[in-house]
From Swiss-Prot:
It comes from Vibrio vulnificus (strain CMCP6). It catalyses: sn-glycerol 3-phosphate + an acyl-CoA = a 1-acyl-sn-glycero-3-phosphate + CoA. It is a peripheral membrane protein. It is found in: Cell inner membrane. This is Glycerol-3-phosphate acyltransferase. CDD domains: LPLAT_DHAPAT-like. Keywords: Acyltransferase, Cell inner membrane, Cell membrane, Lipid biosynthesis, Lipid metabolism, Membrane, Phospholipid biosynthesis, Phospholipid metabolism, Transferase. GO terms for cellular component: plasma membrane. It comes from the Bacteria. The HXXXXD motif is essential for acyltransferase activity and may constitute the binding site for the phosphate moiety of the glycerol-3-phosphate. GO terms for biological process: CDP-diacylglycerol biosynthetic process; fatty acid metabolic process. It is an enzyme of class 2 (transferase).
């Protein structure tokens, strides 16, 4: 570096340190991008800019990366550690050619690779973005533009606090040399590829240009499908075309978002304060996968589970902080009240009625609006369950939005569409007490400003929040596999709804929900709730609780559930202490130590948190219950029983393991129980270790309430094979409700109608009922006997008496 450059850099550092507060994306590029800091590193920046270079330097050093201004020494040659892909325009001219010194550096590096087969220089493309405001539709400006000195000074002053430093995945020059050679033309090609790459980075951070709402409405009104729907509306209601058009305009105004970057930017500060007020921290996992999709030009559809109204804000906040564009969010029309509605709308929410069956004009406009969002490249978010889960379990998916997504693809989108499942978890859900009341029969309170204010008054520290991005589902690939000729149904007019859509959407919905559960986050509270609720008195000594949490942690770590779920890194003791600090347990002390328990009210609320992760323990718990309730089992007997019960658990809890994987998985779980000294395995015979029976009993009881429900339904069928589906559902609910009173079962979902509805659809799939609803008596009786064997005697007796009573009535 020349002395003149060094002096100018020194002069710039002071004002930049005061004006610029950038954010590095990702926050840990060495791990996220698998950067080997022992190999040579060169940074590539889009434009010649000392300000960008110094901003990059600051963040690189903070992140443990080499100083871009330090020389790169290779085989005695001293080279620059950075290149500019394009020159910066001055006030009087614009020079977008690749600087000759950059081409020279690339050429030198490629030549060195030709001489040394072991050399591998890593090029890290890095972009410094000053503000993320999207452009306006019709401006026809490139996504990423160079700035002259005055423009850069203005950007630093106005957007210095909204600066992003994006580090992209490394480009291996060894790979480039082996794939494309080392002559000088490759250096030019490398620079051209980098320029395209930088434009995509900017697009991923800012999103596509935004239209004005009126321009958008005018474009929608010209849609042939909407024009036809307006004509039908006028004809069917016997009104003028002008009045029908006014209705269409009103519907568009009700639905459409009015995205405002300035609101998102200001809201980010408010939400930052809110999360710090509410939570001790946010744990975000697998965001790098989503960033890659955005940068590769995918149309991203986020499909999170729905725990709380906080979900709307949390996911947008996380995406913004991860350097991506907050999505357009499908929100229920119940949230369109003053003042929340207008704020949500400007934050990207578009509103949807709970039902619009039979309203052709509304459904057509909504479908066309959604297709417009996809066509223009805006990311979209909708809650797959349709509403917030009141039980903490994942609800079966509502398929309407998913079907409309597929229909939008049939318009001929020119980009791949990818679903991104998202698991959102909390150590405290603000509405959880309200959910318990609603499950006991209280009417849901309509959302309003007063409800918001009452909620805000309760703000306090709620522990940790979790956002885990699940394994993406590429829809183009999915359709290629499940509807190979789908492209033949592409219709730019949007009138296509082929016969294959319904079955494909139903399968896709199940896969989507399974991927959400695959990305679950176990945490201190969910683990402690699971253990305490498994105890008969909802109480454990502190030592027993710690021991039980240790059992759970070892199972989760040593028998992995999926690739995307997360397990706490803290010790069992630290997790218990953290859960106690959330002030949800009753702590009593006697001469032998602390006893941790749940009062009746908290027992009901804690089922919500247990249900968040019950699927993670479904199989280990089932195996433990078999060992506790049956003597002298062999491994093959356990495998056989698991194979019979698993399909019901899989359907109800959206479990991901395939049936053909079960035998191997059972062996892995048994081996882990052996390593924890809970059981012994001798010549294929399984025996419980009496010294550690409590841990095994608690593990087994987690799934026992689910098995009780199955036992109720199957024994009703055995007693009365002619029962119609509606009668079977009602009688099962009646017996389940009776069990809750007689045996102190506090789970609100225990007699939930939806849970039984899921069970009965699986009865048909597994051949216990035929397509006409006729029962296979022998098969059903055998399964009912197996379920009885897994229940505790007092519960079994209550079910037997209740079934007999209902049959005699």
């Amino acid at each position: 570096m020349s002395s003149g450059q060094s002096f100018s850099h020194s002069l710039l550092k002071l004002p930049l340190s005061a004006l610029v507060k950038g954010t590095a994306i990702p926050s840990n590029p060495i791990d996220d991008h698998h950067i080997d800091i022992n190999k040579p590193i060169v940074y590539a920046l889009p434009f010649r800019s000392a300000v960008d270079l110094l901003t990059l330097q600051k963040h690189a050093l903070e992140l443990g990366l080499p100083d871009p201004l330090s020389p790169l020494e290779i085989h005695g040659k001293s080279l620059k550690r950075y290149v500019f892909i394009a020159s910066r325009p001055t006030l009087v001219q614009s020079d977008n050619d690749v600087p000759s010194d950059s081409i020279a550096l690339f050429s030198d590096l490629l030549a060195l690779h030709a001489e040394d087969s072991e050399l591998d220089v890593q090029v890290i493309p890095a972009t410094v973005l000053w503000g993320r405001k999207p452009g306006k539709e019709g401006n026809n400006k490139p996504y990423l533009q160079a700035m002259n000195g005055l423009q850069k000074a203005k950007a630093v002053i106005t957007a210095g606090r909204d600066c992003l430093v994006r580090f992209s995945p490394v480009v291996s020059l060894r790979y480039m040399a082996q794939s494309h050679g080392t002559d000088s033309s490759i250096a030019h090609k490398l620079a051209r590829v980098a320029r395209i790459h930088f434009s995509r980075q900017k697009l991923a951070a800012s999103g596509p240009d935004l239209p004005s709402r009126q321009v958008l409405f005018a474009r929608l009104m010209k849609s042939p499908a909407i024009e036809q729907a307006i004509e039908e509306e006028a004809k069917n209601k016997n009104i003028s075309m002008e009045k029908a058009r006014k209705e269409a305009q009103d519907i568009m105004d009700e639905i459409a978002a009015d995205f405002s970057y300035s609101l998102v930017k200001q809201g980010d500060r408010l939400l930052g304060w809110l999360w710090n007020k509410l939570y001790q921290g946010l744990n975000i996992n697998n965001a790098a996968t989503v960033r890659r999709l955005a940068q590769d030009g995918h149309e991203i559809v986020y499909v999170p589970c729905h725990r709380s109204h906080m979900d709307y804000l949390l996911l947008s906040y996380v995406l913004y902080h991860e350097g991506m564009v907050p999505p357009h969010i499908a929100a229920g029309i119940n949230l369109n009240f003053f003042p929340a509605g207008p704020i949500f709308r400007r934050g990207g929410a578009f509103f949807i009625r709970r039902s619009f069956k039979g309203n052709r004009l509304y459904s057509t406009i909504f479908r066309e609006y959604l297709a417009e969002l996809f066509a223009k490249g805006y990311s979209v978010e909708y809650f797959s369950e349709g509403g917030r889960s009141r039980t903490g379990r994942l609800l079966p998916a509502k398929t309407g939005m998913l079907a409309m997504t597929i229909q939008a693809m049939l318009r001929g989108l020119n980009r791949p569409v990818t679903l991104v499942p998202v698991y959102i978890g909390y150590e405290h859900v603000m509405e959880v007490a309200t959910y318990a009341k609603e499950l006991r029969g209280k009417r849901k309170e309509k959302e309003n400003a007063g409800l918001v204010l009452r909620t805000l008054r309760k703000l306090r520290n709620f522990g940790l929040g979790y956002v885990n991005f699940g394994e993406p589902i590429p829809l183009n690939q999915y359709l290629n596999e499940h509807a190979p000729e789908w492209t033949k149904d592409i219709d730019p007019m949007g009138a296509s709804r082929p016969q294959w859509i319904n079955p494909v959407v139903n399968q896709l919905a199940n896969k989507m929900m399974t991927h959400i559960n695959d990305a679950a986050a176990a945490n201190a509270l969910t683990l402690c709730a699971t253990a305490l609720l498994a105890s008969r008195q909802r109480a454990l000594s502190k030592d027993s609780l710690i021991h039980q949490i240790e059992c759970y942690l070892q199972l989760l770590k040593n028998v992995p559930y999926s690739k995307t779920y997360t397990v706490p890194s803290e010790s069992a003791e630290a997790l218990v202490e953290h859960a106690i600090s959330l002030d949800k347990f009753v702590i009593e002390t006697d001469t032998m130590g602390d006893i941790i328990s749940l009062d009746r009210n908290q027992s009901i609320l804690m089922t919500y948190y247990r249900n968040n992760i019950i699927h993670l323990f479904a199989l280990p718990s089932l195996i433990a219950q078999m060992i506790i309730r049956q003597e002298n089992l062999t491994v093959s007997q356990i495998q056989q029983q698991v194979a019979e019960i698993y399909p019901f658990l899989k359907a109800e809890l959206f479990l991901s393991h395939k049936e053909e994987e079960l035998d191997e998985l059972v062996v892995k779980v048994l081996n882990e129980l052996v390593s924890q000294d809970l059981i012994s395995l001798k010549e294929d015979k399984v025996a419980k270790n009496q010294a550690n029976t409590l841990t095994l009993v608690l593990l087994g009881r987690t799934i026992s309430e689910t098995l009780q429900r199955y036992s109720i339904a199957f024994n009703l069928l055995v007693s009365n094979p002619e029962l119609a589906k509606a009668d079977l559902e009602q009688k099962s609910q009646d017996i389940a409700q009776r069990l809750t009173r007689l045996h102190g079962i506090n789970a609100p979902e225990y007699f939930d109608k939806g849970v039984f509805a899921s069970l009965f659809s699986t009865l048909k799939q597994q051949g216990y009922l035929d397509s006409d609803g006729n029962c296979d008596g022998e098969k059903t009786a055998q399964f009912a006997t197996l379920l009885y064997a897994l229940l505790y005697p007092e519960v079994k007796l209550t079910i037997e008496e209740s079934v007999f009573q209902l049959k005699s009535a």
